[in-house]
Amino acid sequence: SRVVKDGIVVDFMGAISIVRKLKEELEEKLGIEITEGYTAIPPGVEQGSVKAIVNVVESAGIDVKKVVDEPTAASYVLGISDGVVVDLGGGTTGISILKDGKVVFVADEPTGGTHMTLVLAGSYGVDFETAEDIKTDKKKEKEVFTQITPVLEKMAFIVKKYIKGYKVKDVFLVGGACSFADSEKIFEKELGLNIYKPYMPIYITPIGIALAGMKD
């Protein structure tokens, strides 16, 4: 969405409107009122940005009970205690290094699915929304993958930069930006480590956010 840029809320009222709409749609489907919830942040964001994200959710009528960073949330679903969780999101690449069940390092850089869309917009000479449709069109996946490969290579380089000096063997990819078939092979080539990508990686972090609240 355009209301968030590089993991930071840039359109406060627009973000509230989107969350409120999603809340209403979910309440209608479930037949219940949603009053409490959990939220997540990109790793390493400033405290001011954390407050902004919480304020958006609470302004939409949801009392935030817990905030967790996105890669850590994903680790709850993956059930891992050691390794690197890489969350390839819409605006950022988030990294969490776990050792003996504890997060020992987190980092985040502004490269994600949005940057893939911008590459496609320039390549096809279309606007952002049309490029987004092209990116998610399964019929064009092979063609699109060729063009967004440099973005994935940059993401892999970001991970390599941050995990240098840490003894890790396993890297777990989650997030919508790694949904492309063979995206994990780019990371294997760059990192030379064991790369794992779960089924439907786009849903791993959201489920992890819910599980984070259950750990209290």
Where do the model's predicted regions map?
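Nucleotide/phosphate-binding catalytic cleft detector across ATP-hydrolyzing
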Residues: S1-L88, K102-D216
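Short beta-strand scaffold segments in enzyme catalytic cores
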Residues: T93-I97
